[in-house]
């Protein structure tokens, strides 16, 4: 008896643990095996009794009882009848919960096609039968017959016949001589009769023998789907339904509202339509109705089932009573509101609350202020338990009463409960992992949450009404994780770049800056050999100094001598004397004592950068605990001194430069001059525009620097002592608030503005905000401001979507092992842009592992292979003058299903080597996505003031000797050296003979140095006109025009505003008559023959469309003179608006609009015959392989001449290179370098720092697939794309069997495509295109092994990262232990337990 009672309670089956999920097409038998009964009536529930109708959609006999352990008619009630089936109403007595998982079915009177397999592209049924979707639809929707068995008639198998043709054929050949059918029965019959083995063999044969290029692709597609059916055990005819499953009624509820109305799920409507039409069809068949009526009913049934599965995919959307489209089964899964994203990936959480945040400056870094009311509500169960344990209450009810009355003992207990129990604070939008952090709650009065000021940067929070949510970690494990991993004190460094993120900002910075200012002539300052008081301003003791400050004998800013006591390198006490100020001494008093933290750290002007560096030093040397205490202390110091200083500013603090109007007048004169040049026809409209904009930009910059000089200089009073520093300058210079750009607008001139289209308006705003704008200026400035606000709204969404795609593609990149042992690596060097070092080598290699020994020139090993490059190595590396380092990278990591710790390097958020199980992919995605949102939200800060970012010269950043590589220079008529070669480079060689910098020269640049010159830092190397691309002559001679026919290929345009003529090449391809002209300028010698260039081809320059010709026929020219010029587009404002789409474009690996054409081999260029309106260019490779042909649209400017030699990877036509071409031509390393640099460029422009390794992680995920070039001895087909790891596994097996391995080339996929092609179909389906992903997965019978993070979140298990990764290891150890115990039991030998094998 006892056992039975126990069984009663244990009957609820435990959820099965599983480690993979398979999806396939269900057969009619399978559907019937799930079903508990057939639904025959469309009725739902009786509107009077509210009881379900029998055999209806809510039938209790089929789906189970409505109340627990009670049958419908009430004959059997209570638990003792469990399992009894009532003979009166047929209901089983059990839990009502079974109505959530018992299914029903509808037997269809006629088969119908499953719309997903029919209409989800590519149509699976269509591919399988090799029929067009249009034809299939005509058969299915009863418009055409299809011949199934032609017999002896001349009809073909699968030929479509219209109604008339069918009748005619029957008359002609007799009714029984052939079989033709219509509707889904026909398709089902064809699918049933398919012989998959034979078709597959035929297709393989055809692929092997076909010669055309396009055919194999089509055949491959079909072969793939046929193989999928063979492998997965699905039968083709299952794509046609004969039975429709009905989902459990509690998943499509029907709830009575008051007033006799019902709220119902749309599915019930859709099911009712199916049942109604099905029943009507059954009746019509029984009544032997005319064929046409039955056919119509079958078509309607097909449409009803289509609407049930995927409403709106075919034909009109079916709407409900309120004209709203009904939500079908497919819609339940799809999109943001679908099952995947709404319920499985994002759930609402209990034990949470939200409130407004206010600042809590007296909190410690690990604390937050929690309102008592909130805490009482959130910790209720803990309080009840503690009240019970202490004997204050015997039952939960009593405890509840106590808490509701807020008795004093409740507050005491709340204090106990909350002690050491961290809570998590989250601020939406959570853009990176620092958007959720754990704090220890501190109970406060009031209703607002208090937040520590230093964590605001991580949350991106401010106190203008932001709200935050509080979550309580309940279990011990959760509390442990919150404390160890998420505590705010454990998140001092930014995961994106490793810099401290707990940095003081705003008031604190201002206070510290004020504290560290030095003022000359302040009272009590130390004067050397001061006869009156030689000891004035000399202090050795902190108390003495405080006393002097309090008695006003000395100010915070006076210069004093101070004896500092600290620790020497071995930890011994030392003392030194410093020239400093009392303010800096106060600041030094909070520094931790450590040999590596000397007084020099604070003995300087404390700007935000310096403070950040100081925190960094303290963190690296003194550890986390010291840094946290230190941060809290400097915060207090900063606040108190900002408060004491009382810094404020007034109108007069904005100093307008005195010479403002003289500079403006100068510029106006210059602009007038350009106007005149334009009137005289010396420059074009576009060039004038560019020059005017340039002039105003320069004027604006000059004014800004004048103003900065005025504001930053400290005035002296009559005694020669410093007056107060300008407040605005203090705020801006310290980094507390405001930027030079904003100060410029306040006090210099507002500057150039952009139109909404992004072009710059020629007339700038000359006034500043202090003087005030006039009406016209104000109007011009509204554009930029409005555009900024509109952009903000749009780009937040874009940036969020980019982050979502990044997370999706990288979610399964997890650290799986310590070292994969690969020998490969990538080479890193400093990035130099226009002669400026943009990213130093040190910043790029810090915290990465070396791929080979890093050896100094004298042979000493600085860093051995496989070791991490730390801060202490950097000095040695720069001393050794090393320019290039080979480091390990995730791009070359050989770990399967993840990456290894050595290839990844340092965990930036902790400053230590990365741990196993760290989800580096998600961190990378957040690090790249988070600033995207930040930046887009901040576009309007510059107020649209145009910033011209176009350099037109190179300056040397080093001293040294000039060497010129690939010398192609000539002296032109003006006596300037001009670069006439395409790859001329100026190399700066240091005194030790190492190359310090290499500058590639723009074609047509005027070179200011020559071979062997000594060059100083900052000296000009070359300059060029940024607005035009010149076409030069390479030899001296006489100009001759070729094919430049007036009105056909050249036109003299007279500028309407100037009356000046200029010759422009026009598009000559318009008419057939002129299509084969080749407009060019040739250089003749004295005899009138075309001269030869040194490499043997003719001296002839082909002209592109819109080239402006600058020489007359017959004119004498010297090498390096300009023959014609092509105007480049006007300078656009570079703003991250261009940036975010650019980042997305690079990650999506889209081909740019005007993609560059890259040379695939090194070789010689020759021009072939023109083809229609394209130029034919042939590259003959040096290695003797087949020549490569390129067809280039005629208007494009090709800067190569006949006979030019190009290197592999050189640009034949300029433009943005397509990433796929870089991968194919130069390989993975070059591609990665290109993507990393291009993406970094966008972020750098905005001053955002992201570590390269994050971008590398994403690029690795984009390169997961391989295209098969040679299938070796395997079953794989050439041209197929498979996973890299799959290829490795297949090859290992083939090599083991001594067969020929498969060859493949890496393929670059955009992030969206890569996410949709992950091995896990659950992850792909929850991302985008759910229908397509699931259809494909079902056809292939895919198995999801649940390896990534997303799949595991969806099925509700622990994610295989972080602590979850360890759980998996522990489980596998436990399993092995179980096996051993079982084996031992079986043996029953009584031997000792064998040694446990180590975890893999």
UniProtKB/Swiss-Prot annotation:
Organism: Methylobacterium nodulans (strain LMG 21967 / CNCM I-2342 / ORS 2060)
Top-level taxon in the UniProt lineage: Bacteria
Cofactor: binding comment: Binds 1 Mg(2+) ion per subunit. Binds 2 Zn(2+) ions per subunit.
Family under the similarity heading: Belongs to the RNA polymerase beta' chain family.
Protein name: DNA-directed RNA polymerase subunit beta'
Binding-site residues for Zn(2+) 1, renumbered to this chain: 71, 73, 86, 89
Enzyme Commission number(s) from the entry: 2.7.7.6
A cellular component annotation (GO) from this entry: DNA-directed RNA polymerase complex
CDD domains in the cross-refs: RNAP_beta'_C, RNAP_beta'_N
Cofactor entry: Mg(2+); Zn(2+)
Gene Ontology MF terms in the entry: DNA binding; DNA-directed RNA polymerase activity; magnesium ion binding; zinc ion binding
Main enzyme class: transferase
GO biological process: DNA-templated transcription
Subunit structure as annotated in this protein's UniProt entry: The RNAP catalytic core consists of 2 alpha, 1 beta, 1 beta' and 1 omega subunit. When a sigma factor is associated with the core the holoenzyme is formed, which can initiate transcription.
Swiss-Prot/TrEMBL catalytic activity: RNA(n) + a ribonucleoside 5'-triphosphate = RNA(n+1) + diphosphate
Residues binding Zn(2+) 2, per UniProt: 820, 893, 900, 903
Described function: DNA-dependent RNA polymerase catalyzes the transcription of DNA into RNA using the four ribonucleoside triphosphates as substrates.
UniProt binding sites for Mg(2+): 462, 464, 466
């Amino acid at each position: 008896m006892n056992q039975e009672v126990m069984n009663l309670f244990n009957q609820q089956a435990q959820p099965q643990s599983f480690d993979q999920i398979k999806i396939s097409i269900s057969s009619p038998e399978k559907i019937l095996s799930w079903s508990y009964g057939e639904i025959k009536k469309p009725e739902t529930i009786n509107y009077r009794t509210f009881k379900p109708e029998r055999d209806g959609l809510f039938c209790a006999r089929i789906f189970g009882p409505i109340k627990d352990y009670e049958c419908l008619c009430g004959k059997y009630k209570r638990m003792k009848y469990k399992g009894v089936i009532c003979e009166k109403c047929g209901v089983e007595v059990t839990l009502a919960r079974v109505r959530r998982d018992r299914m029903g079915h509808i037997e269809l009177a006629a088969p119908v096609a499953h719309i997903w397999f029919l209409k989800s592209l590519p149509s699976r049924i269509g591919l399988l039968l090799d029929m067009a979707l249009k034809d299939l639809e005509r058969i299915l929707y009863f418009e055409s017959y299809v011949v199934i068995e032609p017999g002896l008639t001349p009809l073909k198998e699968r030929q479509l016949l219209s109604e008339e043709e069918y009748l005619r054929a029957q008359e002609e050949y007799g009714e029984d001589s052939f079989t033709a059918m219509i509707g889904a029965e026909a398709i089902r019959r064809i699918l049933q009769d398919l012989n998959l083995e034979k078709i597959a063999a035929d297709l393989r044969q055809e692929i092997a023998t076909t010669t055309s290029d396009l055919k194999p692709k089509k055949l491959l597609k079909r072969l793939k789907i046929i193989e999928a059916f063979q492998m997965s055990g699905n039968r083709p005819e299952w794509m046609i339904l004969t039975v429709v499953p009905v989902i459990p009624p509690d998943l499509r509820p029907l709830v009575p509202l008051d007033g006799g109305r019902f709220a119902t799920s749309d599915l019930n409507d859709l099911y009712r339509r199916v049942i109604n039409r099905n029943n009507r069809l059954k009746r019509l068949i029984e009544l032997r109705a005319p064929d046409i009526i039955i056919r119509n009913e079958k078509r309607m049934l097909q449409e009803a089932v289509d609407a049930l599965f995927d409403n709106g995919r075919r034909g009109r959307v079916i709407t409900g009573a309120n004209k709203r489209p009904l939500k079908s089964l497919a819609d339940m899964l799809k999109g943001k509101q679908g099952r995947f994203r709404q319920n499985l990936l994002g759930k609402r959480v209990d034990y949470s609350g939200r409130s407004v945040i206010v600042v809590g400056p007296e909190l410690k870094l690990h604390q937050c202020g929690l309102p008592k009311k909130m805490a009482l509500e959130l910790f209720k169960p803990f309080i009840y338990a503690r009240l019970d344990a202490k004997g204050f209450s015997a039952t939960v009810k009593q405890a509840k009463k106590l808490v509701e009355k807020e008795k004093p003992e409740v507050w005491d207990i709340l204090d106990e409960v909350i002690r050491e129990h961290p809570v998590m604070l989250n601020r939406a939008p959570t853009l990176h992992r620092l958007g959720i952090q754990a704090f220890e709650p501190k109970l406060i009065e009031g209703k607002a949450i208090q937040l520590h000021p230093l964590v605001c940067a991580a949350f991106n929070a401010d106190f203008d009404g932001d709200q935050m949510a509080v979550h309580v970690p309940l279990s011990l494990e959760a509390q442990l994780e919150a404390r160890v991993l998420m505590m705010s004190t454990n998140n001092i460094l930014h995961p994106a770049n490793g810099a401290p993120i707990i940095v003081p900002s705003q008031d604190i910075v201002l206070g510290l800056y004020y504290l560290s200012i030095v003022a000359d002539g302040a009272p009590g300052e130390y004067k050397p050999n001061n006869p009156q008081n030689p000891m004035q301003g000399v202090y050795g003791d902190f108390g003495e100094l405080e006393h002097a400050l309090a008695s006003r004998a000395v100010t915070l800013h006076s210069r004093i001598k101070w004896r500092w006591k600290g620790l020497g390198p071995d930890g011994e006490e030392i003392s030194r004397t410093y020239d400093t100020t009392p303010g800096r001494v106060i600041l030094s008093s909070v520094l931790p004592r450590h040999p590596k933290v000397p007084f020099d750290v604070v003995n300087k002007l404390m700007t935000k950068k310096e403070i950040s560096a100081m925190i960094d030093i303290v963190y690296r040397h003194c550890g986390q605990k010291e840094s946290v205490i230190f941060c809290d202390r400097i915060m207090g110091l900063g606040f108190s001194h900002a408060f004491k200083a009382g810094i404020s500013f007034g109108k007069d603090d904005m100093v307008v430069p005195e010479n403002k109007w003289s500079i403006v007048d100068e510029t106006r004169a210059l602009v007038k001059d350009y106007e005149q040049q334009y009137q005289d026809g010396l420059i074009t409209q576009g060039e004038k525009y560019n020059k005017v904009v340039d002039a105003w930009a320069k004027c604006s910059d000059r004014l800004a620097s004048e103003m900065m000089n005025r504001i930053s200089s400290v005035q002296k009073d009559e005694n020669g002592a410093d007056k107060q520093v300008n407040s605005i300058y203090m705020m801006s210079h310290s980094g507390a608030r405001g930027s030079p750009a904003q100060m410029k607008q306040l006090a210099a001139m507002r500057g150039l503005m952009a139109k909404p289209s992004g072009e710059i308006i020629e007339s700038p705003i000359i006034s500043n905000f202090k003087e005030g704008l006039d009406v016209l200026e104000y109007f011009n400035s509204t554009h930029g401001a409005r555009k900024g606000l509109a952009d903000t709204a749009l780009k937040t969404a874009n940036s969020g979507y980019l982050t979502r795609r990044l997370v999706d593609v990288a979610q399964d990149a997890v650290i799986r092992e310590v070292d994969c042992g690969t020998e490969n690596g990538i080479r890193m060097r400093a990035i130099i842009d226009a002669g400026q070092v943009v990213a130093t080598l040190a910043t790029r290699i810090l915290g990465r592992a070396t791929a080979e020994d890093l050896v100094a020139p004298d042979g000493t090993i600085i860093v051995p292979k496989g070791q991490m490059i730390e801060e202490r190595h950097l000095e040695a590396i720069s001393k050794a003058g090393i320019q290039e380092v080979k480091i390990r990278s995730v791009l070359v990591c050989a770990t399967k299903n993840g990456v290894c710790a050595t290839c990844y390097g340092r965990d930036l958020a902790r400053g230590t080597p990365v741990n196993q199980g760290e989800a580096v992919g998600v961190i990378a995605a957040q690090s790249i996505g988070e600033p995207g949102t930040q930046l887009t939200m901040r576009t309007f800060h510059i107020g649209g003031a145009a910033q011209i970012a176009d350099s037109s010269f190179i300056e040397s950043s080093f001293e040294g000797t000039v060497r010129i590589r690939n010398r192609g220079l000539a002296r032109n008529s003006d006596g300037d050296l001009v670069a006439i070669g395409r790859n001329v480079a100026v190399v700066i060689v240091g005194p030790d003979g190492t190359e310090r910098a290499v500058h590639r020269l723009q074609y047509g640049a005027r070179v200011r140095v020559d071979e062997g010159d000594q060059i100083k830092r900052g000296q000009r190397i070359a300059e060029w006109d940024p607005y035009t691309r010149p076409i030069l002559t390479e030899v001296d001679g006489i100009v001759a025009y070729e094919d430049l026919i007036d009105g056909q290929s050249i036109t003299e345009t007279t500028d309407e505003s100037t009356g000046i003529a200029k010759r422009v090449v026009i598009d000559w391809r318009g008419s057939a008559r002129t299509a084969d002209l080749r407009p060019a300028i040739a250089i003749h010698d004295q005899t009138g023959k075309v001269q030869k260039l040194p490499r043997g081809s003719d001296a002839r320059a082909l002209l592109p469309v819109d080239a402006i010709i600058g020489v007359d026929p017959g004119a004498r020219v010297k090498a390096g003179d300009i023959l014609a010029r092509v105007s480049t587009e006007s300078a656009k404002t570079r703003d991250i608006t261009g940036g975010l789409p650019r980042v997305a474009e690079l990650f999506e690996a889209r081909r740019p609009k005007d993609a560059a054409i890259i040379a695939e081999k090194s070789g010689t260029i020759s021009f072939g015959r023109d083809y229609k309106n394209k130029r034919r260019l042939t590259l003959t490779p040096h290695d003797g392989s087949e020549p490569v042909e390129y067809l280039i649209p005629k208007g494009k400017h090709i800067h190569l001449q006949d006979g030019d030699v190009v290197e592999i990877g050189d640009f034949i036509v300029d433009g943005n290179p397509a990433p796929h071409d870089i991968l194919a031509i130069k390989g993975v390393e070059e591609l990665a370098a290109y993507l990393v640099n291009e993406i970094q460029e966008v972020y750098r422009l905005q001053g955002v720092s992201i570590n390269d390794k994050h971008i590398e992680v994403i690029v690795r995920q984009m390169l997961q697939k391989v295209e098969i070039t040679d299938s070796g001895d395997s079953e794989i087909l050439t041209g197929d794309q498979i996973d890299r790891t799959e290829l490795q596994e297949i090859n290992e097996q083939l090599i083991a069997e001594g067969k020929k391995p498969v060859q493949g080339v890496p393929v670059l996929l955009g992030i969206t495509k890569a996410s949709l092609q992950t091995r896990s179909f659950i992850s792909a389906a929850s991302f985008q295109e759910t229908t397509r992903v699931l259809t494909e997965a079902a056809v292939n019978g895919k198995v999801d092994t649940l390896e990534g993070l997303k799949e595991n979140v969806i099925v509700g298990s622990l994610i295989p990262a972080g602590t979850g990764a360890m759980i998996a290891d522990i489980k596998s150890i436990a399993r092995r232990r179980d096996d051993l115990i079982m084996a031992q039991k079986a043996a029953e030998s009584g031997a000792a337990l064998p040694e446990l094998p180590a975890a893999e």
